[in-house]
Amino acid sequence: MSLLTEVETYVLSIVPSGPLKAEIAQRLEDVFAGKNTDLEVLMEWLKTRPILSPLTKGILGFVFTLTVPSERGLQRRRFVQNALNGNGDPNNMDRAVKLYRKLKREITFHGAKEVALSYSTGALASCMGLIYNRMGTVTTEVAFGLVCATCEQIADSQHRSHRQMVTTINPLIRHENRMVLASTTAKAMEQMAGSSEQAAEAMEVASQARQMVHAMRTIGTHPSSSAGLRDDLLENLQAYQKRMGVQMQRFK
């Protein structure tokens, strides 16, 4: 796996699924391929994106700044600085300075990542802030190691939280989670179907599923009534793709 592929993988792992994630993935690909060369426009676009947490925006802004060539005097962006200040905690800043001194001695991406993984997310963010604000300099490779370590920690905590929700025995939470997943799957089906004649059936299935979820929420139903709803939708989507000549493994 190339360095930039690895960076893209880690960064995208902390972005919530949805149309915005696909858009960000495209921007990252363009930036890494040297296609998107106006940092000012890119940062303005990032600043106005909805849904993303300030820290995720800060990390993406840091990655864009590392990758896109820019004039030396280009102003640093406040939304990135605020996200990478470690919540203003002086302890985070102290640890960030210690980490920075260690990173100065590293020359490889993996070496930097290993060193960074032993620090808290707050300290890692503060260290990125130091580098972003030009208070310290490291090689791009080392900076990317710091980025990936931060993303790994965030993704770990998100995964723990997700696992807790999936394994919860509370039937109401499981019921709502199944309905949310069915609804987002239906939305994805509608987007993928496009406007071809064969798409009418897939659109109809997706529309019915969304109406069903809407009705279930409106009248309130037994928590077990949503079981299998998303799986049925995915089976329909696979059947549609087969008819369209697209062979895909089921994505569960």
UniProtKB/Swiss-Prot annotation:
CC per GO annotation: host cell nucleus; membrane; virion membrane
A biological process term (GO) from this entry: viral budding from plasma membrane
Positions of region (Membrane-binding): 1-164
Short sequence motif Nuclear localization signal: positions: 101-105
Subcellular location: Virion membrane; Host nucleus
Top-rank lineage group of the source organism: Viruses
Membrane topology category: Peripheral membrane protein
Molecular function in Gene Ontology: RNA binding; structural constituent of virion
Region described as RNP-binding: spans on this chain: 165-252
UniProt keyword annotations, A-Z: Host nucleus, Membrane, RNA-binding, Viral matrix protein, Virion
Further comment: Most abundant protein in virion. When expressed alone can form virus-like particles in transfected cells.
Family to which the UniProt record says this protein belongs: Belongs to the influenza viruses Matrix protein M1 family.
Oligomeric and partner information: Homodimer and homomultimer. Interacts with NEP. Binds ribonucleocapsid by both interacting with genomic RNA and NP protein. May interact with HA and NA. Cannot bind NP without genomic RNA.
HAMAP family with a match to the protein in the record: INFV_M1 (MF_04068)
Protein's name according to its UniProt entry: Matrix protein 1
Organism, scientific name: Influenza A virus (strain A/Chicken/Pennsylvania/1/1983 H5N2)
Gene: M
